[in-house]
């Protein structure tokens, strides 16, 4: 099975990327190597819309439920 790599953008994992000449570039981590306490990955809000049966657009749903549905953890 292949590796899953993610980009963490918090202060703990930030580093200066000297090779590319960019400052504050985030460090890439192999998600399979993290401890369970660090392995939680946050995805943005997930919205399921049946376009054929619904006349509510995505922006309306985001506006109405942005305080209720903040994030999903796997």
UniProtKB/Swiss-Prot annotation:
Q: Which Pfam family would be a valid example here?
A: Orthopox_F7
Keywords assigned by UniProt, alphabetized? Early protein
Describe what upregulates or represses it. Answer: Expressed in the early phase of the viral replicative cycle.
Q: Which InterPro entries match?
A: Orthopox_F7
Q: What family classification does the UniProt entry report for this protein?
A: Belongs to the orthopoxvirus OPG051 family.
**Name of the protein in question:** Protein OPG051
Give the species this sequence originates from.
Answer: Monkeypox virus
The gene name reads: OPG051
